[in-house]
């Protein structure tokens, strides 16, 4: 089959797949360390989804009041509902201030205080004094376009350090032999050629799989391509049942309104004009963690206190803030609300609804980015030749629920740590192990089979069935009945993938084929998500079970590992959460009842 395709071979020290914040920070970090580095991306780097991150990036700088990285760690552990690994959380929070200063030195145009310091705003779940003090102003912001500012800066650094980019290349599958990764195969959308990239290390920075749902803040490119490749390689994914619903997606459009809007003083109201969050989170109110706010909004709507003709959303008020503050600190969402909701935020409230936003689960890694698996009694056995970072990975610093502004921090901290580890492991220009012909042949055969699929179902129709099923059956609130139905429905939809029809057989800019390959990735991750959720019989973080409303620390402080066997059956396993810290700089944080 390989003879039927124009295959171009490359050899690099490292290949990064994905050019968002994590991928770019990793790529130029590796190039800076002297490694011959390639970066494969299916879209132009500055169109990666990091560009849509609005509110900011967290670090205990203390510019707007006293702060400490230990308080940041406490908030992150609590936010994770004690499913986050405390060694990785310590590493992230301790390294956060240096990561911000590094970004500033690279040229990120952060907003400033009157005395020239980096401006920091309050964000949900961020406190002082280990949760006993006032709200922390910890989120460093570049107005409400922080991701845009960071992504462009990291791309400039990547060009400076001569990362070799392969832009508009679609990653098809990993080259796996003897339980280790030897490279990746990609398809050049512009000329139709296939490329075999040999590498001592492949770094997956491919983002989340938000597009498995019908309504999501994610770009249409967020199809979890890294997770799909990992599942097909026979490796597990971790904690896939934990899907974050952001409280404030614009009603009907799904576009994000940053949590920074509430950080600047915005508040939610129901049909009675009541600030209902005061009932659900008396201390934090509208700045409780995202899972808490999304559940509160859903309850208000269910109980008939929603707004609008169908009483199916709530209002976010910013119109009490001065136009000068809105213009200076929230210019992007003012524009977004005007375009997608027809609202002038200086005069009227924004209609909002909880919307799928982030995947806490992903490819299991350690805090140095290395992919790990459970091997007998060793729960953290390293898979050679492969790393994962960013939303594609599950380190796990976010556990069952991510705090807002910890995601951009995750990207730059673990992007950097993966680069340092790769430099430690790889000698530049060292020879590659030989690759068996069958390894490449297997990947080409799968690609060819999808390309020439001539069944009866259009990719768009099957994708819509998956998205609607996930939206209705694996949502903010869950029950065994709904989840079991969801398992059956997603399994059936996945089985029907073999009956898809590809009308366009060409290799140049074939969007039909791209979407078919993306759907394959989405379906596998949708299936392990719903199966993992059906098995976890407790409520923790973003996984809220109406039939199991309480957190069960005795049985469920453990990570879910999910894989798909050759017969298409989901296999679930579990491993302990790391409840010990990395160093003696802070004591472990024991589980307590999580209230805001």
Swiss-Prot record:
GO MF term set: electron transfer activity; flavin adenine dinucleotide binding; succinate dehydrogenase (quinone) activity
UniProt: FAD binding residues: 18-23, 41-56, 225, 391, 407-408
Major place of residence: membrane
Stored Gene3D superfamilies: FAD/NAD(P)-binding domain (3.50.50.60), Fumarate reductase/succinate dehydrogenase flavoprotein-like, C-terminal domain (1.20.58.100), succinate dehydrogenase protein domain (4.10.80.40), Succinate dehydrogenase/fumarate reductase flavoprotein, catalytic domain (3.90.700.10)
Pathway it works in: Carbohydrate metabolism; tricarboxylic acid cycle; fumarate from succinate (bacterial route): step 1/1
Residues binding substrate: 246, 258, 357, 402
Active-site residues annotated for this sequence: 290
UniProt EC number: 1.3.5.1
Any one GO BP annotation for this protein: electron transport chain
Secretion signal, residue range per the UniProt entry: none
One Pfam family in the UniProt entry: FAD_binding_2
Modified residues (Tele-8alpha-FAD histidine): 49
Gene Ontology CC annotation, any one: plasma membrane
Cofactor names: FAD
Annotated compartments: Cell inner membrane
Membrane topology according to the record: Peripheral membrane protein
Domain of life: Bacteria
SUPFAM superfamilies, A to Z: FAD/NAD(P)-binding domain, Succinate dehydrogenase/fumarate reductase flavoprotein C-terminal domain, Succinate dehydrogenase/fumarate reductase flavoprotein, catalytic domain
Keywords of this entry: Cell inner membrane, Cell membrane, Electron transport, FAD, Flavoprotein, Membrane, Oxidoreductase, Transport, Tricarboxylic acid cycle
Catalysed conversion reaction: a quinone + succinate = fumarate + a quinol
Subunit architecture: Part of an enzyme complex containing four subunits: a flavoprotein, an iron-sulfur, cytochrome b-556, and a hydrophobic anchor protein.
Family per similarity comment: Belongs to the FAD-dependent oxidoreductase 2 family. FRD/SDH subfamily.
Cited PANTHER family: SUCCINATE DEHYDROGENASE 2 FLAVOPROTEIN SUBUNIT (PTHR11632), SUCCINATE DEHYDROGENASE [UBIQUINONE] FLAVOPROTEIN SUBUNIT, MITOCHONDRIAL (PTHR11632:SF51)
This protein's name: Succinate dehydrogenase flavoprotein subunit
